[in-house]
UniProtKB/Swiss-Prot annotation:
One of its GO terms (cellular component) is plasma membrane. Keywords: Cell membrane, Disulfide bond, G-protein coupled receptor, Glycoprotein, Membrane, Olfaction, Receptor, Sensory transduction, Transducer, Transmembrane, Transmembrane helix. Odorant receptor. This is Olfactory receptor 1E2. Gene3D superfamilies: Rhodopsin 7-helix transmembrane proteins (1.20.1070.10). One of its GO terms (biological process) is signal transduction.
Amino acid sequence: MMGQNQTSISDFLLLGLPIQPEQQNLCYALFLAMYLTTLLGNLLIIVLIRLDSHLHTPVYLFLSNLSFSDLCFSSVTMPKLLQNMQNQDPSIPYADCLTQMYFFLYFSDLESFLLVAMAYDRYVAICFPMHYTAICFLLHYTAIMSPMLCLSVVALSWVLTTFHAMLHTLLMARLCFCADNVIPHFFCDMSALLKLACSDTRVNEWVIFIMGGLILVIPFLLILGSYARIVSSILKVPSSKGICKAFSTCGSHLSVVSLFYGTVIGLYLCPSANSSTLKDTVMAMMYTVVTPMLTPFIYSLRNRDMKGALERVICKRKNPFLL
């Protein structure tokens, strides 16, 4: 399909971030530090969950996949951004641009599905604590959040995102791009590419609206529904300590959900007529750079289970014979 594309350009030019030349080195160091923090933090989560058997539970299965998704999501855009800032070469080949767009959609969709799975896991843990305890510690196959169900949810998320990202990529590949090849963004954003196309983009726009509702809005509503049930269940708890514990358990997930869905829905599904390039860039930075970096801190590095796992792994390294 890409071979039939009638584009007359071989590459695009990414304008990058609106940064003054004298601020270039400082911003480069800042974004490099943020990217390395994202990589190391999410890798630490994945390794700890893999090595510590106490973390082989539904919530940490979803969290390890979310950390891997965040790691890859950030890696889709950040290396090219850092390279352009360092080399002052904003060009990106046409095929590479479509490839970047594909993986950007892939991992953003995957994050959306995994956030829903984690919300449902919190719902089961709080509203059905006896079932959840049996699942987590006795490994019984129950009708609620069984290990097979958890693995199926993760596998289905990976498969569905593949088809959705491929659909948008193939639709983009059929468009014609003429003289204008300047993308006012720091990555190959789908909406920015559509504005450069010199052929009819109505099919693309309808697919974005319809599939966006399925991939973003419906999962967001499912998350809100799960937390509505959670709040209703929490308010029935007579103990103030239990209420505080339940809210602290859900608060971290809700903060990431608000940051991710708020910016994505506002940027792609509810764009304003007077939306500026700077505003769109800042919003994109929030969910492509900031959210993946904050995930380890919000979810795990302040989590008692993760701290315990880190201590056990360190102790095993010091004393291999320690059980």
